[in-house]
């Protein structure tokens, strides 16, 4: 058993509770790169739900070694009797390659889930990943939604109908590495995980170099913030019913003491409902200021008019170009 680790059977008992808490249904697809985190996920799932998953490895085509790494995962799956898929992409290198690879990877996994009738995509993000994400978003001045970090259950980005499950958010990286070592598996070691050109790698190294920063504490805080964000969405849902939004718009008298954060969430939903796009945060702030001042402005094809006191929302005439609120 690896240093600081636990037996696979003991870990599986713990994982079973984490997995069942996500209320999984039907077969799911595990995203397995061959790294220690995703191999540990595969080991745990085979202990807990051996008939309920398949494995998918995405070969982005960005490194010469990627085809061999995908073949390694395929070989492991064959030995263990696990159904697997290798999804090959042809991405070009260059700027923002990690973000482009992430989007393409999720799109490929979502396509597989739709095609094969799988109920969810499952990834091996863990507590250390969550802590790094939280620090990155703190550096950017993120709001509550961003600081809530990764959710244990959400939707695949760009494919809202496909569930995305992350059952390992309460697990540390070292625990997962130990499970893989104890199983005698040799994981893939991606060199980009040590490339200091990437912000996440720099943050990871700083957090590892000091005992003053506890990833488990960051991850717990992200979980608490996610609960607060869910409570905010609960309130927005109820206010949305008061607005009575139709396909053409609505007129609404907002409470005078409506908290700013609720107002911004509601305006975001108005724009998404009538304009079909997700507005930028700074534009929403300016739009809210205009409405609270009794003005009129258009944002992303949606007109907001508060000159009568009530807030009236409608689609802007198509021949007029959208302008940002003053």
From Swiss-Prot:
One of its GO terms (biological process) is tRNA modification. It comes from the Bacteria. Pfam families: ATP_bind_3. It catalyses: cytidine(34) in tRNA(Ile2) + L-lysine + ATP = lysidine(34) in tRNA(Ile2) + AMP + diphosphate + H(+). ATP binds at residues 33-38. Transmembrane segments: none annotated. It is found in: Cytoplasm. GO terms for molecular function: ATP binding; tRNA(Ile)-lysidine synthase activity. Its EC number is 6.3.4.19. InterPro entries: Rossmann-like_a/b/a_fold, TilS/TtcA_N, tRNA_Ile_lys_synt, tRNA_Ile_lys_synt_N. Keywords: ATP-binding, Cytoplasm, Ligase, Nucleotide-binding, tRNA processing. Gene3D superfamilies: HUPs (3.40.50.620). Signal peptide: none annotated. GO terms for cellular component: cytoplasm. The N-terminal region contains the highly conserved SGGXDS motif, predicted to be a P-loop motif involved in ATP binding. Belongs to the tRNA(Ile)-lysidine synthase family. Ligates lysine onto the cytidine present at position 34 of the AUA codon-specific tRNA(Ile) that contains the anticodon CAU, in an ATP-dependent manner. Cytidine is converted to lysidine, thus changing the amino acid specificity of the tRNA from methionine to isoleucine. This is tRNA(Ile)-lysidine synthase. The lineage of its organism: Bacteria, Pseudomonadati, Pseudomonadota, Alphaproteobacteria, Sphingomonadales.
């Amino acid at each position: 058993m690896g240093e600081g680790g636990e037996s696979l059977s003991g870990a599986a008992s713990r994982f079973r509770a984490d997995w069942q808490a996500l209320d999984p249904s039907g077969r799911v697809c595990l995203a397995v790169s061959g790294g220690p985190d995703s191999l540990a996920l595969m080991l745990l799932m085979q202990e807990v739900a051996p008939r309920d998953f398949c494995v998918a490895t995405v070969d982005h085509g960005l490194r010469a070694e990627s085809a061999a790494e995908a073949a390694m995962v395929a070989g492991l799956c064959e030995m263990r009797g696990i159904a697997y898929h290798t999804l090959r992409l042809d991405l070009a290198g260059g700027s923002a390659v990690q973000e482009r690879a992430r989007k393409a990877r999720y799109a490929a996994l979502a396509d597989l889930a739709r095609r094969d009738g799988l109920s969810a995509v499952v990834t091996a993000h863990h507590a250390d990943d969550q802590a790094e994400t939280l620090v990155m978003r703190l550096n950017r001045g993120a709001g509550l939604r961003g600081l809530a970090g990764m959710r244990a259950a959400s939707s695949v980005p760009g494919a809202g109908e496909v569930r995305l499950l992350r059952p390992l958010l309460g697990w540390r990286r070292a625990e997962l590495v130990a499970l893989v070592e104890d199983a005698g598996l040799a994981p893939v070691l991606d060199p980009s995980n040590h490339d200091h050109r990437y912000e996440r790698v720099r943050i990871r190294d700083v957090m590892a170099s000091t005992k003053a920063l506890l990833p488990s504490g960051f991850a717990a805080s992200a979980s608490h913030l996610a609960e607060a964000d869910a409570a905010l969405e609960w309130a927005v849902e109820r206010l949305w019913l008061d607005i009575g939004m139709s396909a053409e718009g609505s007129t609404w008298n907002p409470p005078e003491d409506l908290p700013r954060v609720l107002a911004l969430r509601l305006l975001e939903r108005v724009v998404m409902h009538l304009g079909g796009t997700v507005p930028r945060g700074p534009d929403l702030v300016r739009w809210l200021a205009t409405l609270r001042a009794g003005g009129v402005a258009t944002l992303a094809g949606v007109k907001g008019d508060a000159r009568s006191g009530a807030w009236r929302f409608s689609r802007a005439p198509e021949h007029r170009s959208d302008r940002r609120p003053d």
